[in-house]
Amino acid sequence: MEAAHSKTTEECLAYFGVSETTGLTPDQVKRHLEKYGHNELPAEEGKSLWELVLEQFEDLLVRILLLAACISFVLAWFEEGEETVTAFVEPFVILLILIANAIVGVWQERNAENAIEALKEYEPEMGKVYRADRKSVQRIKARDIVPGDIVEVAVGDKVPADIRILTIKSTTLRVDQSILTGESVSVIKHTEPVPDPRAVNQDKKNMLFSGTNIAAGKAIGIVATTGVGTEIGKIRDQMAATEQDKTPLQQKLDEFGEQLSKVISLICVAVWLINIGHFNDPVHGGSWIRGAIYYFKIAVALAVAAIPEGLPAVITTCLALGTRRMAKKNAIVRSLPSVETLGCTSVICSDKTGTLTTNQMSVCKMFIIDRIDGDLCLLNEFSVTGSTYAPEGEVLKNDKPVRSGQYDGLVELATICALCNDSSLDFNETKGIYEKVGEATETALTTLVEKMNVFNTEVRNLSKVERANACNSVIRQLMKKEFTLEFSRDRKSMSVYCSPAKSRAAVGNKMFVKGAPEGVIDRCNYVRVGTTRVPMTGPVKEKILSVIKEWGTGRDTLRCLALATRDTPPKREEMVLDDSTKFMEYETDLTFVGVVGMLDPPRKEVMGSIQLCRDAGIRVIMITGDNKGTAIAICRRIGIFGENEDVADRAYTGREFDDLPLAEQREACRRACCFARVEPTHKSKIVEYLQSFDEITAMTGDGVNDAPALKKAEIGIAMGSGTAVAKTASEMVLADDNFSTIVAAVEEGRAIYNNMKQFIRYLISSNVGEVVCIFLTAALGLPEALIPVQLLWVNLVTDGLPATALGFNPPDLDIMDRPPRTPKEPLISGWLFFRYMAIGGYVGAATVGAAAWWFLYAEDGPHVTYSQLTHFMKCSEHSPDFEGVDCEVFEAPQPMTMALSVLVTIEMCNALNSLSENQSLVRMPPWVNIWLVGSIGLSMSLHFLILYVDPLPMIFKLQALDLYHWLMVLKISLPVIGLDEILKFVARNYLEG
């Protein structure tokens, strides 16, 4: 049934053809079940394990690796002799890497898919219905409830479907619907129609929503919608329809993979074509096909050399280390790539309640009457410190602490706060914090009584558990609460009837009243001045109301409560307590005592964090279900808006936003910093508009209502105290619910991206070097300088360790003073590409040079000529060109060992170069990252391992080197540091300014 909130109760009953007293007939139930289906959210069609595994191989880099592994595998089949074992090492290792990566990926995805299932926990198990086949109420499974059913709900029940209230069987009906609307206090419901067809959920005061909880009272209603038709069902549909986009990093790596694959394909084809003339060389036994296969193997080796196999693993490790660092700062990251996305966040959309504020209502101002002189009324105004439920804070007058017990008016005010109250404080020993038991507003009054301590109770030696209600207990021992007149919408107040605890006390019975100021003050005939009561006159009333108006608007926007006493209430037996319409009569002839102003105060550290965001070029938008006045006031308090800034086109309610034409809605999202009275759909819409401007949006939320927007935003941030649905739809959970933690996480994200750039570039310049090396040997016709298994070892192990250690580079000092980087910024700019080509060219030439040096000049080398070396394929016993040369020398392990040692040593020098993109090693010495120094030591140790520990030299086709060779290795390798220093100097002085 659409728009049930706008119809009368009679229209709703007529729509389903049902009577409130008897309910649906079995025949109607059957028809409705066929028409509307069961009252449950359908199970999500998750991806099968096989689909998830296949998805992990959609990455281009991974596919190229897979192809290389398959080809290597096929070629290994045709190997003969002792090479067979080593030939299988390469495809086997590549496959192992791919499998490990896929496992990590599948595990991440599986976690993400649990989001929609978590909604199930808000589906109630049972419901109480009236049906024609039974005289009394019956309990049935919630899934069997159908539209048109007459349902009964009472305090503590979970609402089983979206229900239009027909009758309220108690004084009031309060519902906690914070999971759905984000309202911080429970909502009072009624039965009258709400004529606005476009009312937001917060304004549908005659509806109960599926999954919300009844906080007080009892009611009967008719089911309007079930299952997917309910508000919580609509949220599920939104979540199911939201596809996760790739993170900026994933997009970058995909682009990079594409470029790499094109370059690799070109080089492989080029190497193969260059050598067509050598296919018939004697070394291949004169067989053209064997020659073709030989050069095909070299092309595959090239592909292996060009792909940074270690890159996926190093990125995963770096992100995982980043998540650990963030967890220490209370930010728990659920999906690894989002760690880096945080670094380019340009807009943070934050919930107000609990994130920017403490979600702990507290009284911050109060006043009592000081004296009345004719028409002149003077007030005593006090402010109260402390912004949580902890009973710690001071009462200040003119910014100086005062003892509340000195003021008779404050003693009475504290008495009313303590007695006209059903809530209390509780010290949670596991969390180590004070928590509310009951209503937020009432708990604020309980906390105020503890801070005031009007009877100077000795509290210093009490334990935290005893301290929670110490001062309230003293007041409750003096007066005994007889009964409560519950809050009702018509009089907007509640009261308690109290008698003195000691029978011969000087005071008689009293009624203490608290409620909305305008309602209570209208029923006050007197005001309390000290211990006397003075008649309430027009000017006095005006003065009181003007202060309340001032507190309720402007910067403070406090929620004010008036407190009053009826000094001589009627006798108890004269009062009719089961008729709430009479309560107004009993709460008349009141004496006004004072007013308290409370708010959900901003967290202390938020203001500094907002300033940090401003410096870092990040816009903060507050989004809340609260009303606009409160929202703007909090924005001014925390620095989103200036004190006197005109916010005409920078703050909107959900309704105002909807009324704008589409083009203006887009513009509003570009400018605005505050949205109030919003619904879940608004949040998703705002994210969509921001994304259309290429903004990277972080969205916070804690309720079920926030889940679609959390899923849609690039970074969904859930609160630690939030619902399971919000947590599972998000990328990050704030353990302490604190906005400042987001800012710390953004800083960490930026540092991670910078470090990631460094190690990606480090690995790539290494691969460029390997490619140049293989290309040169093939183009010049030299013997192989490096074989695939050696390249794999370098790419995975020797390069992998320093690359991972580069993830520990300290963040730049000005990291939060720069604007967010644009997601479109390339990983490697033109100048950097030139730099890697230059360094890579040197690496390749040095590696080939080291191998050639052994053939041409080494003491223990064969001293062949350059011509013999470049035509070694033609070498045979009978060739006059190779007289006195043993052809087997061209397959000796020494030149390969020289080449590999130079490659590894240069890579270690390169790792030092990568400490900073443009800073000289003189300014940023190696020991700023001690992990890097350690990893270089470890990499060199592993290199010595494959040189000097049997049987490794045989597997890797290497030979032990002596000091003479090592000195040559250093001479060839160290110049790379000088070369990079020159390039950094150019970048610093000619390109950065």
Curated annotation (Swiss-Prot):
Tissue expression notes: Detected in fast-twitch skeletal muscle (at protein level).
Coiled-coil spans in chain: none
Catalytic reactions of this protein: Ca(2+)(in) + ATP + H2O = Ca(2+)(out) + ADP + phosphate + H(+)
Sequence positions that bind Mg(2+): 351, 353, 702
PTM annotation (Phosphoserine): residues: 580
Keyword Signal belongs to the record: no
Record's subunit section: Interacts with sarcolipin (SLN). Interacts with phospholamban (PLN). Interacts with myoregulin (MRLN). Interacts with DWORF. Interacts with VMP1.
Domain text: Ca(2+) and ATP binding cause major rearrangements of the cytoplasmic and transmembrane domains. According to the E1-E2 model, Ca(2+) binding to the cytosolic domain of the pump in the high-affinity E1 conformation is followed by the ATP-dependent phosphorylation of the active site Asp, giving rise to E1P. A conformational change of the phosphoenzyme gives rise to the low-affinity E2P state that exposes the Ca(2+) ions to the lumenal side and promotes Ca(2+) release. Dephosphorylation of the active site Asp mediates the subsequent return to the E1 conformation. PLN and SLN both have a single transmembrane helix; both occupy a similar binding site on ATP2A1 that is situated between the ATP2A1 transmembrane helices.
Protein name: Sarcoplasmic/endoplasmic reticulum calcium ATPase 1
Organism from which the protein derives: Bos taurus
Lineage: Eukaryota, Metazoa, Chordata, Craniata, Vertebrata
Gene expressing this chain: ATP2A1
